[in-house]
Amino acid sequence: MKFSLENIISIRDFKKSDVEYILNLAEEMEPIAKSQKVCHEKDGKLLGVMFYEPSTRTRLSFETAMKRLGGDVVGFNQKQGTSIQKGEVLYDTAQIVSQYTDAIVLRHDMEGAARFVSNIVDVPVINAGDGAGQHPTQTMLDLYTIKRTLGELKNLKIALVGDLKYGRTVHSLVYALAMFNVEIVFISPSELEMPPEILRDLEKLNCKFSIKNSLIENIDDVDVIYMTRIQKERFPDPKEYLKVKGQYTLTSKNLKDSNTIIMHPLPRVDEIDFNVDNLSNAMYFKQAFYGVPVRMALLDSIIK
């Protein structure tokens, strides 16, 4: 089995065999990610990170992943202090970074930015989030978390909760879940429902889904609850954000006697109470760690 992609732009570019290849390779990478083994596979290779939007987990896990593989990292994690402040456009910045590095990881506020850059440079490009568009590497670590926790991906029932309109993590995740015959339950305020074009795509993919408003009533009816924060920065009107803020909050009381796996791409705001953290089925911090072996697998597959 081989990995067929040269760039990681959208989960929709993946074949099921690509997904399975990365998940299997990530498991091989885990001992290296945990410092139990040393790897020199990417000695002498440089990863360029271009982060136009804030990031903690994605940026740090990519940097960790590259260094665990034996490579190194250069780049920026904010516009301040770069020529972007002087008016340099994405095209020029990407051209320059591509001259210095063996691959680029890009986070940008414009949907389609990663695809655009992949078409103009000669090195592999990884989409680390493009506005409200896609976040394919998050999707891969989400799948890996589910598989490592439950032992399989097929025939599960998964609830996606919160900001389904602007959340790029769920926009990516649903297409991958559809590959594995997963039933999806969408739970959100009516103002933040999954975009209709994505629902139409799921229908074409014969993916079973339902749309609901109550989180509490559905906790024990699913295998996984995937919480998301309400993304304040995506709202054109702050008043609209205040209308939906805090509508869904998981507490240990809600989850009493429940074995449902709790996931979250993080950061959280108020949607998961801190008293949930110590529950055995709270997987979001382990989920964040799994970003390292998964991104190691992706980097290893596209950097030659």
From Swiss-Prot:
Superkingdom of origin organism: Archaea
Keyword Transferase: yes
Annotated pathway: Pyrimidine metabolism; UMP biosynthesis via de novo pathway; (S)-dihydroorotate from bicarbonate: step 2/3
InterPro entries for this protein: Asp/Orn_carbamoyltranf_P-bd, Asp/Orn_carbamoylTrfase, Asp/Orn_carbamoylTrfase_sf, Asp_carbamoyltransf, Asp_carbamoyltransf_Asp/Orn-bd
Positions of carbamoyl phosphate binding: R57, T58, R107, H135, Q138, L266, P267
GO molecular function, one term: aspartate carbamoyltransferase activity
Coiled coil: none
General function of this protein: Catalyzes the condensation of carbamoyl phosphate and aspartate to form carbamoyl aspartate and inorganic phosphate, the committed step in the de novo pyrimidine nucleotide biosynthesis pathway.
Annotated protein name in UniProt: Aspartate carbamoyltransferase catalytic subunit
Species this protein is from: Methanosphaera stadtmanae (strain ATCC 43021 / DSM 3091 / JCM 11832 / MCB-3)
Name of encoding gene: pyrB
